[in-house]
């Protein structure tokens, strides 16, 4: 990529339940400006930005008087759409990445194929329904929405862990790190689409 990144995108999405605006720069430095009204979720999105080096601005207003579900899911949808738009043809990307990430008592693996084909494999179990006031089931809901709309195949496997906060946070950090690697420009094929099909449109 040139010094001035062209892999940027902004998406605004409004429904009767939420109003969300997202901007991303895939060639950023991990700067973030995130306000969703859900404190724990903000913290997780900050980890996603910081460790992927994707600059993110996420402004979300949702029906939090009901619960956090619509805000979390719709943020995943909008963020995924922004990433897909910024990727364009997905020309020159590394495409694949995987790793195991340690966080204190917890070990979580993530693998990604930025293929244009949307899929989530989720092997993560929480031992409590909530982290503070945040429903732990919403972690999966976010990644499901994000993967489907970014057009990526994403596998997340928690191998072990005792602390539910660490389990949740390790999923965001592991996904961040594989996104960082897979979205990098491959210096050996800067202008090529990394597929024998000649397309990564699904």
Curated annotation (Swiss-Prot):
The keyword rRNA-binding does not apply. It comes from the Bacteria. One of its GO terms (biological process) is L-histidine biosynthetic process. It catalyses: D-erythro-1-(imidazol-4-yl)glycerol 3-phosphate = 3-(imidazol-4-yl)-2-oxopropyl phosphate + H2O. One of its GO terms (cellular component) is cytoplasm. GO terms for molecular function: imidazoleglycerol-phosphate dehydratase activity. Keywords: Amino-acid biosynthesis, Cytoplasm, Histidine biosynthesis, Lyase. Its EC number is 4.2.1.19. PROSITE patterns: IGP_DEHYDRATASE_1, IGP_DEHYDRATASE_2. InterPro entries: IGPD_sf, ImidazoleglycerolP_deHydtase, ImidazoleglycerP_deHydtase_CS, Ribosomal_Su5_D2-typ_SF. It is an enzyme of class 4 (lyase). It is found in: Cytoplasm. Pathway: Amino-acid biosynthesis; L-histidine biosynthesis; L-histidine from 5-phospho-alpha-D-ribose 1-diphosphate: step 6/9. Belongs to the imidazoleglycerol-phosphate dehydratase family. This is Imidazoleglycerol-phosphate dehydratase. The lineage of its organism: Bacteria, Pseudomonadati, Pseudomonadota, Alphaproteobacteria, Hyphomicrobiales.
């Amino acid at each position: 990529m040139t010094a001035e990144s062209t892999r940027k995108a902004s998406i605004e999405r409004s429904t009767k339940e939420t109003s969300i605006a997202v901007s991303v720069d895939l060639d950023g430095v991990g700067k973030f400006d995130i306000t969703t009204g859900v404190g724990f979720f903000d913290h997780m999105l900050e980890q996603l930005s910081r460790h992927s080096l994707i600059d993110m601005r996420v402004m979300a207003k949702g029906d939090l008087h009901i619960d956090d579900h619509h805000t979390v899911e719709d943020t995943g949808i909008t963020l995924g759409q922004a990433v897909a738009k910024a990727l364009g043809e997905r020309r020159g990307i590394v495409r694949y990445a995987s790793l195991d990430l340690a966080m204190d008592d917890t070990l979580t693996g993530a693998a990604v194929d930025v293929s244009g084909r949307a899929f989530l494999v989720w092997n993560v179990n929480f031992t409590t329904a909530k982290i503070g006031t945040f429903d732990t089931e919403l972690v999966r809901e976010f990644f499901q929405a994000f993967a489907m709309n970014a057009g990526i195949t994403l596998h997340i496997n928690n191998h072990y862990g005792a602390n539910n906060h660490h389990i949740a946070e390790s999923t965001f950090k592991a996904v961040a790190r594989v996104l960082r690697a897979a979205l990098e420009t491959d210096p050996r094929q800067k202008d090529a689409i990394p597929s024998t099909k000649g397309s990564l449109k699904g």
